Regions:
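Surface-exposed, charge/polar-rich loops and edge strands
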Residues: 1-416
Length: 416
């Protein structure tokens, strides 16, 4: 049983929604954010990457940066560009990227259910990244970025959500510069809110798809603010901003690997070592892997197909049978010397949204010696890992389309 609740969202006035809504803070660096803000000063990156509105030499983790985030957030309200809903609402967020459509419910999810693993995790978090989000939430008194949650889809929820969409007009409907259509509906009717809440009570567990640092930070903030004696369990900080999608609407793309050198091996030595654990063949149908346990390798201007040999991985191991584990355990670590992909500077990662031509061009330009195109991790694999209480290897999943920040913001201050 999961418990969600509506909240009074802070969101853009409709005429400003397309300009304010922004990609998440963690998919770009400060310079990229600065370039976006130069073109579009209203972008919510003013809040989520407020260092981009300050001097080049500013420490992005200084208190001045978090204070600037609060100043910039307040300015949206004082300038009349964002307003807070006066009654608690749910929000339906529809995204379309090409032929792919996903429809999620924006709601306040329970910190306590996260703590009790009713909301399940599959990634490790880094303390420094958690602390950054803690500082940001405390300074702004807001959760500005949503946690991307999923659940095993239920037809009755889908049917009801679609019926609500059919009966309402969207408050926003715009296409962002990356070609993704974003549509938002507000659910403010008390009976409709009660029905959505009831329907989700029949969902036994939910899973974090993306946003492990945001959810971990929300729990730490709740622990800190919960020390205030006069506060109770209904405080807004005991929940976190989430967009909840059924698993059958989620789209995971490939998360590909680039390695700077061959670890001192010649090309012939490298291919010989690779051939011990993988069948190597010529590619006939383009570079994308066509099935699990297949990989496409780009080396010296040529794509090759790698297929994991039988017996080189434990097929019944939920972690060991993942393609990212097979490549790491049988090639990246033993042959290329990449022992810890989280920290090794010789490896880089690229989301499949950028395409395999870009991957190959990085090798052709000499920045890397070899690239590996992956078959996407499936939602079924992610859920199995989370249900087993295990941790996915780093850089296993790349979700598209990305949620836009500022579609709805969750305020957690004392007056909320």
């Amino acid at each position: 049983m999961t418990q969600i609740r509506p909240f009074c969202g802070l969101r853009p006035v409709p005429e400003y929604a397309a300009e304010i809504a922004a990609l998440p803070y963690d998919v770009m660096d400060t310079e990229e954010a600065r370039q976006i803000l130069n073109k579009n000063p209203l972008s919510f990156l003013r809040v989520t990457k407020s260092e981009a509105t300050m001097s080049d030499c500013i420490d992005p983790h200084s208190q001045a940066v978090y204070k600037m985030a609060k100043t910039n957030l307040d300015r949206y309200l004082s300038d009349g560009q964002m307003k807070k809903d006066t009654t608690p609402c749910y929000y339906i967020y529809r995204q379309q990227m090409g032929q792919h459509i996903q429809i999620g419910l924006v709601a306040a999810a329970s910190v306590e259910e996260y703590r009790e693993n009713i909301i399940k995790k599959h990634e490790l978090t880094r303390h420094d990244k958690e602390q950054d989000r803690v500082n940001h939430i405390l300074a702004t008194e807001a959760q500005t970025g949503a946690v991307f949650l999923t659940y095993k889809g239920k037809p009755e929820i889908n049917t009801y959500v679609l019926s609500l969409m059919g009966a309402k007009k969207p408050v926003y409907d715009f296409t962002s510069e990356d070609g993704v259509q974003h549509t938002l509906y507000v659910v403010e009717n008390l009976m409709e809110i009660a029905e959505l809440t009831r329907l989700f009570e029949d969902v036994p567990v939910m899973y974090i798809a993306d946003g492990h640092h945001r959810s971990a930070a929300a729990m730490r903030v709740a622990d800190e603010l919960g020390k205030t004696p006069r506060h109770g369990s209904n405080e807004e900080y005991n929940t976190f901003l989430a967009v909840i999608f059924p698993d059958n609407m989620m789209q995971i793309m490939d998360y590909n690997r680039l390695v700077k050198d061959l670890n001192g091996l010649s090309m012939e030595e490298f291919l010989s070592r690779v051939g011990e654990k993988f069948e190597i063949s010529e590619l006939e149908n383009g570079p994308k892997p066509e099935a699990r346990h297949q990989f496409s390798m780009y080396l010296t201007g040529k794509w090759r197909r790698l297929t994991a040999k039988e017996g080189t991985f434990a097929a019944d191991d939920v972690i060991g049978s993942l393609d990212v584990s097979i490549l790491q355990d049988n090639l990246l670590a033993p042959i290329l010397g990449i022992k810890d992909p989280r920290t090794d500077e010789r490896i880089n990662f690229m989301g499949g949204i950028r395409g395999l031509d870009v991957l190959a061009s990085k090798v052709d330009a000499g920045a890397y010696s070899v690239a590996f195109a992956m078959y996407p991790t499936s939602m079924e694999e992610l859920i199995k890992v989370a249900d087993a209480g295990k941790i996915m290897p780093p850089k296993s999943t790349w979700f598209e389309p990305k949620l836009r920040d500022a579609m709805v913001v969750h305020l957690i201050g004392e007056d909320e």
